[in-house]
Structure formats: C-alpha cells, structure tokens
Amino acid sequence: MSHEGSRQARDRGVTRSKAEKARPPTQPVPQVDIVPGRLNEAEWIAFMSLEEGEDVVGDILADLMTRVMECAFKVYLTQQCVPFTISQAREAMLQITEWRFLARDEGESAVAEDPTWGEDEEPLACTTDSWAQGSVPVLHTPAPVCVEEQFHNEEPGNPDQFLLGSSWDKESQKPTQPSEPSAEPKVTPRPTATLEAFEEAEPGDALEVPHGQEGSHMLAVPSKESLRSTAEGERVYSPQSSLKQPQVVRLQASEKESSFGSHLSLEDLYLCMPQPDAAGDRLSLQSKGQLHSSPIGSESHLGALTPAEPSAFQEPEVLGERPKHKTTTLRMDSSRLPRHWVRPVAEVLIPDLEVHPLEIYRGRPRRSQAGTATSACESQALSSRAPSKPHVSSPRFPLQRCATFRALGPDPSLNLAQTSPSFGSNVPFLSPGFRFLPRNPIPPDVASTPTPKLWPLAKWPSGWEREAEQLGELWAGRTRVPPQGQEPVEVTPLEEDSGWPLAAPQVLEATSQVLWKPMVISETMKLVPGVSMWNRGTQELLNPAVIRKEAEEGTPQAPEQQPIQTGVSKPQVIMKQIRNETPKAWLLPTKPVPHSGS
C-alpha cells in the first residue's frame, strides 16, 4: 500500500512538470493611452467613476434649490398684489381722462419747405410719331383758296352771313358799266339785313351789308320809322316801269333758280331764314307753305325791298350788252358751317297747337268769330258732360307772373321755334319771354301794398334806385308793368276762363339768389365788385369792400332798397307723362324767402 502511494505521487510530479513545459509563456497586456504619455486607460476609468458621484450630488442640490425658489416666489406675489392693483387703477383713470380731453393735432409745419413732402418728378410720355406701331399717315386735303378767303373775310360765328353773302350774291353781282340812276324804284330780290337787325340798331348807327362786295357798302340807318316808310314806299310801282319790270324779274328769277338749286339745300335755307321773334314778328302760315313748295318762293321771303342801286341784272336794251354767267361755281359744304341745335330735356306739349301754332308762340292767340263760337260750343259741351257740382269758393294758387321759361340753348339770340333734331314733331318751343299768367286778376288792394322790408340792411349802388323800386313793387303786388312804348294788355273774361297761358311783357329780372353753406367764416371773405352775399344767421347783406369803403367815407348812397327773388324752378316733365295722352306739368316749390310774407 505504501508502495502504491509513492508511485502515484511520483506520477503527479512527472505530469505537472510535463504540463508546465508544454504551456507557452504569457505575454504582457499592452496599456492603451487616452492622452499619449499623460493619461492612460486606467486613470480615465478612475476619473469617470469620480465624476459619476459628483453628478449625483449636483442633481440632489438642484432639486432642493428649485423647491426653495418656488416657495419664495409665492411669498413675493402675495406681498405685491395690493401695490399692483393700485398702479393698474391709476393708469386706467389717466387714460379715461385723456380720452375726455383730446388735444388738437396741429399737423406738419413748413410742409412747402420740407423736401420730403415734395411731389415725385414723373417723366413726360414721348409723343407718338409716324414710326410708332400702328400709326398711319394722314393726308389732309387743302381747302380751295376762295373758300378760305371768304372764311377770313367774314365774321366768325355767323353762318347766315356767309351763306347769304357767298352763294347768292356772288353770282348775281358782276362789274358793269354805271348807268344813269333812274327815279323809278325797282324791286331786286336779293338777301339783305332783316328788319330785326335794323330795329336792334340805334338811330344813327351804320349797318354793314352781309355779303362781301368790293365797295363794302355801309347803309346809314337814321331811324326805325324812316326805314319802314322807305320800305313801304318801294312797294309802290310806277306806271312807266310796269312794262319793263316783268322782264327784269323773269331774268333774275331764272338766274337765281339756276344757281340756288346747285348750291344750297333745304336745310341750309332753313338755317338762313329769319325766325319769328318773341317781340311779335308777323310771319304768316302762307310763307311756310311757299318755302317748302318752290325755291323761288322761299327766296322771296329772304329777299327785301331795297332802294334802286346799280345792279348786275338789268335789261339788255338799257345796257346794250348781255350779262355774263360764271362757268365754274363752287359748291359749299354745309357740314363745315357752324350750327346751333337746341337739345331740350323735356318738351312742352300744347293740345291746341294744330289750330293756331304761330299765334300761341307769339303769346296772344287770335280769336276770330269762328274760333270764339267753337270755343264756346266746346265749353258748353264739357259743362253738359261734367256732373253738376255745387260751387265752392276755394283759393286758387296761380303761377307767378315772373316765372319764365329759360332758354334751353347757350346763345340768347337763338330762336327756340326751330325744331330740334332729337324730336320728330314740329312743335315750336316757348320763347324766353313767355310767361304763365294767373286766371284770376289780383285785387287792387294787394297791388297797392307797400314794398315789404325783405332785407333791412341791403344797400343798392348809386344809379339803380328806380330799377330797384320797380322790382320791389313787382314782387310786392305781382303787378304787370308794360315796357316803354306799349300799352298794358287788357285781359278779357273769355281769355281768363280759357286757361291758356298768355304772353306777359318783358320785365327787368333781378339776379337769381343761390343758397349755399359756406365752409369758411363770412367775415374773412373778400367779395369782388358786383357780388353780394346774404348772411341768414345775422340777417345782413355783405357787400364788396369798395361799397363798404364808400359808405365809410360818407359818399352819397342810394336809399335803402330791397332785392327780390325771381329765380323759379324750371318745370319738370317725366317720360311717363309725355307718353300719356294728356300731358301734365308742374312747378316744384321754391325755398321760402326770409320775411317775404308770402
């Protein structure tokens, strides 16, 4: 047993030594440097374990500090609650007070001198020339020399003078040998100045012949009566000239007929015709029929009876030679001549226009025996058809006598009897002097009332006392004052009941008044001479500085006068009423005049 134990111990030693001899030698582990030569891996691991402990301690301290600061802030808010409420209330009260008392904004000062307020300069657009895209050159045809010379010689704005002077008398007048002046008056149908032109001229004035003659004849007009007397004297024919006169008239008619149809149209002739005036020119209906029937008849209306003058149309037996004719004539373009057309907004319709159109236009319709009987029958028929009603005296409100129909065109001399192209009817319009008169006359006690004191402080300039007093009487009593040289119109009972508008004489109209709200103080305004302003608040009439200066210096002023109001609103007619069978028109009420009493 002992032998076996020793053997085992010996075997173990042998095997251990063999194993140690067979095991390779262990190599040392190389060290990794984090920072070469300064910090190795073992030192880095030791530092990281130390920082982890510091981070844990820092988190614990931060949590503790946060809890302490929250408790301190809550205590601070509790202490500042009352002071904050007081400060907010103070600011609110100050803001409300500032809203109640607003300060005025003076704006910018010296804006004109500030360069930042100037307007930016904008370059001008280039003009379009012939090289622009889409531009087409236009060739203007030059007008004939004779037409341009006639336009320069004639006065501008007078188409009647150009038509009468260039187309009618140019052919008829030829330089002829002067013949012996005969004592026999001759009738030469050539266009001359109408009776209206002579009546408008004062005695002693000179009127120029419309057509352009080489001699430029000037006719001296001594007076209206002498002109009418000479015109009537020329209508008397002497027995010696009765044999030669038909030949002269026939020759002149043939010459006029050959040149008239090729130069002027019916429209041009209508423009050249003297229209009837509101003063009472007597143009019969027969002349209108002759105007449309033949050119010779229309020429007779345009022509006037003139004294015997050296004329181109004389008998061949007297002159010994035949008159020459112009071979080339120039045709005038009527579209190039200036025209005045009236385009009214509304047309006043009169039912009885077909019966007496010209009489209604002149103002007083002629009432013949047949017309009176017809009107009487019509009134009886209407009274029989209408049911009988008890007569109740009710106040009537007639239109004012001063209510005039204003002219619809800009030219005051333009006659409104001419038909407008916008209307197809031949209804003549009312003249500017046409007025509606009341159906019942005004009692004499009303007409004799004194002039009311409309404007107590109004002062009229010197030299207008009579006109102002007359206007005041017209406004106070609505009296009719006939013009100078005419008798007052007597209104018959038949005309009063007819209800038709009658023509009142021309009266002096005052300047229309305009109510307006000034944007500046009236005391600071400077009025130009001739302009006055009525202050309704102070009931004072503001005059220009020149009149005030005269009043302060003590110059004699006119007695206290009162201006009147003549501006009446125009009648307005709507389209629906024009289309109806029975037209209706009314006047809009005007604004009341202060202290007028009406």
UniProtKB/Swiss-Prot annotation:
The keyword Phosphoprotein applies. Residues 1-23, 225-235 have a biased composition (Basic and acidic residues). Keywords: Phosphoprotein. InterPro entries: DUF4639 (IPR028042). Residues 369-386, 558-569 have a biased composition (Polar residues). It comes from the Eukaryota. The modification Phosphoserine is found at S238, S242. Residues 1-32, 151-190, 222-241, 366-396, 551-571 are annotated as: Disordered. PANTHER family: CHROMOSOME 2 OPEN READING FRAME 81 (PTHR34438:SF1), SI:DKEY-97L20.6 (PTHR34438). This is Uncharacterized protein C2orf81 homolog. It comes from Mus musculus. The lineage of its organism: Eukaryota, Metazoa, Chordata, Craniata, Vertebrata.
